[in-house]
Amino acid sequence: MTVPISILEKFKLLNYDKVLNNIDNPKGKNKIILDTDTANEIDDQFALAWTLLSEDKIDLIGVTAEPYSFQHHREELIQAYKIINDNEINNTNIELVNSYSSWVKGLVDSEIDPKNIYFDTPSEGQEKSYNEINKIFNLMDINTNNRVFRGSTEYLEDFDQPYMNESTDFIIQSCLNNLDEKIYVCAIGCLTNIASALLIEPKIIKNLVVVWTSGFPSYSPLNNKPSLNLVQDVKASQLVFSCGVSVVYLPGFNVGAQLTISLPEMNEFVKGRGKIGDYLYYLYTNNPLHKQRGVQDQLMKTWIIWDIINIAWMIEPSWVSTIVLDMPDLDDKLFWTQKKRKQPMREAVGIDRDSIFRDFYIKLDNLK
């Protein structure tokens, strides 16, 4: 279901110019909260490490743990695996098969039955992320100073029943205690914590700026189902794009997807750069998604470090080319649709991949 009018009426909408000001390119040093499903794969760890290495541009006031889970893939993956193995592909199932063909191929090549793959629950994902956040701080010998918070253990099921937890409370209090400043929440996973905070205290739309990476460009006709960040919690995604909060949208597909890194680069620029460099190298060479999907030929593959796009925009907006356009709605079928009421949104359309990684590598190199 899309967001009910009764829910949207709780939000006092900002005028057009106020939203434009909120989504303007960041200048100087800004307060951010990193909202992250850190243990999901490996890109969040890169994003958090780069954030902690960028104190000149980022005032990291908190890190909030998000839930994550791939459980929504299980039934379709098993079904596609059986169809392909039994050679029963036809016009009625070809779309499903195409969605999972590369995953199934990896499992077949690795002799893995999808029925034997364990997918973390959202609650387990949140707790693993919380622990992983603390691990990154420890590896970098940085005191958390009570800046790490547990988040929601489940996805938003009812707009009338948001989840109060450490993360939502921290987001709310950060906004209310700094009314004259923008509070950027760099969301690099699902939007559960942010949506719950908005539903609990709608007043925070005044100075909350949601910087989110996910999905296809808002002008794309493609379905957003492939986006993990979006599809895990559809209600939360719909709420953020409907309630009037200021949004900087950084599409993963086509834009963030350019942030690839290779094993030779990891060897040359990351490995040996302090405990965190060695850990990032370990993650790259022991990627949990490689194991989950039966990826074997890692040597000649790159990996996308999606989530550093948020941090790149906060550090140097020119590295992430953006335009201001009308914010869309997200329908129940996960397509972007035209919104009746005009609200501006900043959206990424291009990226300076080399400058982004150069900054990251230089800062890591100082840890040698």
Language model regions located:
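N-terminal acidic, glycine/proline-rich low-complexity segments
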Residues: 2-368
